[in-house]
């Protein structure tokens, strides 16, 4: 919100500098982003009167004689297409400074002496987006009353201080000059002074010319007035200056009046050309699927049933709360104007403006809320301004559909409630003074009082809001420093936080380095490594396609990080991340996705460097699986690894799904060579786990076992097996023998070679047995080995060598 300091002083009688005002507002709840004076950096810019203007043959130039208040006219060569004799212009005399600190000097153009420069507004540093279109390609023409030789700043209000406010969603009442004036008046204990317009109505009633109706619950109220015999022309300079300083381009007097009322009241308005209506009944309704509308910017908008439209003869003529339609826009030939003032549901407007990427001053105010109490007042004010600036005749009365509550909202509390929460010792007289400054009504006493909150402050509705208002006006800096009276509560990690912290510690203990990757990625990468892809959740208006969809896996983001580092000659990497993936089982356009915590890691390169006594050792599947085994052992979880070829981006012979209680919770393996090539990375091993599943499976209680004093006994067994039999199948068979004293199963050798028949392999295991309460005997261990051998023979066809 850009606030004109000059305009503000017309509404509130304050005698403070803009800088002091900005500091005071920032400390009372409305942050000031900065203060800008458009004239800063500009100098020696004066009013010039073009006495004569001659075309220079065979050029686009003009040789002008300009009166700048000196004894003799000043000769200036100008190339602007709209320069002509008789107009008042902006002249930068030699030595002047214009935008970008450019200094004007005497010069010669095509051999003709030029003693200055006739300036456009762009050359004064104003943005193209706010300059009237009639002057966008030429010089600015000043009002007739401008005096040659005068500094131009006062004629264009370039000497005004523009205060930029950062308005939070709860203070949308400050999105208007009246709202800001009320705030400033409360801060300084002043009264507001709002100008009144003398509205003179004709004998003809508005209801004779137009009627309105509402056909949607998202239209809270809709009101109109009609102004006849208007003369569409440029607005007076003061109004153009005011709009440009607020960041709005002047269009014509009719449109400018609606924008003025928007800034003044915070009430969005629209003006229709009545003569372009096919019917005299306006209906505000929901759009129908398949309908479309060409808006004022010339774009065709395809509508949905979630959009609100203003219709005439059942045809959309405006996108309610967002932008008007081109078919009924005001132009130079318009004579009868229909003014619209309405209140639309903020959520509906937000959806429409977001879907169409069409945000406007009007839509932002409807989204945040408008003052119910001034809808009709703003409508009457706009009609009176058209009467004044466009010589229009205002039809009597207005037509309205839908009524809104305008009476103050009553909120009750007590003095004790206030003081306990602020740590103060305020008296009831203090409270009365503060609410009087705010313009709120107050009845009752210190035991219990009721505050009548005006509709302009729709953010105040509960006792806590009243406490905030008291604190703001009393002064946050005056609040005493106090300690909480309630006893403290010992902090405790949630199960999710505890698991996250433990996994992070284990990962870093394994030598992994934490990274944080983007949750937004491409639609392809979002599902690239997902075990069970769901509906894709995409942004409607992404900054780039690389950040357009919410990820459903974390590995793709980790591989981007691997690629980034490999490209910079860092090829030995061990990375991990704990973050969220986003699963969407419903409609992504209507429902939010489920956020699920995942853990993932990626390793590549060497785990051991070559030296005088050690060979270089590259990472492999077993390093990745070993990391997971350590993790699961420390979490006291038992998982299964099941080989899989179903993950297209993983190596079909070096990938396994991870099962916990028969449910897939993740995967581990080598990235498919084709995928690795696409990422420009070397052989890389990755794993990803669902941490929510881990948390659900964690044992609730930990049982500590006494360390036994009795020795363990170990037996080695070599097995001849079919080549297809996996290590997991062998472990499962050994465990199925049900030997309770078996405490460890370790694979220490795998052999395939000439001494083994084709299609076979040898696998050697070391089995450890221990009785925590007694010594084991050789006979007992022999029985255990017999049971295990039998299970291996029956289940995997193993032959003990």
From Swiss-Prot:
Superkingdom: Bacteria
Which keywords belong to this entry?
Aminoacyl-tRNA synthetase, ATP-binding, Cytoplasm, Ligase, Magnesium, Metal-binding, Nucleotide-binding, Protein biosynthesis, RNA-binding, tRNA-binding
Q: Name one GO biological process term.
A: phenylalanyl-tRNA aminoacylation
- Domain tRNA-binding: start-end pairs: 39-153
Q: In this protein, which residues make up the domain named FDX-ACB?
A: 708-801
The cofactor(s) it depends on are: Mg(2+)
Pfam families (alphabetical)? B3_4, B5, FDX-ACB, tRNA_bind, tRNA_synthFbeta
Record's InterPro entries?
A: aa-tRNA-synth_II/BPL/LPL, B3/B4_tRNA-bd, DNA-bd_dom_put_sf, Fdx_antiC-bd, Fdx_antiC-bd_sf, NA-bd_OB-fold, Phe-tRNA-ligase_IIc_bsu, Phe-tRNA-ligase_IIc_bsu_bact
Report the residue ranges that make up the B5 domain in this protein. 406-481
Q: Per the UniProt record, which EC number(s) apply here?
A: 6.1.1.20
The record's section on CDD domains has:
PheRS_beta_core, tRNA_bind_bactPheRS
Q: What is its main location?
A: cytoplasm
How is its cofactor bound, per UniProt? Binds 2 magnesium ions per tetramer.
What is one term from the GO cellular component aspect held by the record?
phenylalanine-tRNA ligase complex
Location in or out of the cell: Cytoplasm
Reaction(s) catalysed (UniProt annotation)? tRNA(Phe) + L-phenylalanine + ATP = L-phenylalanyl-tRNA(Phe) + AMP + diphosphate + H(+)
Q: Which GO molecular function, any one, fits this protein according to its record?
A: ATP binding
State the family named in the UniProt similarity comment for this chain.
Belongs to the phenylalanyl-tRNA synthetase beta subunit family. Type 1 subfamily.
| Protein name stated in the entry | Phenylalanine--tRNA ligase beta subunit
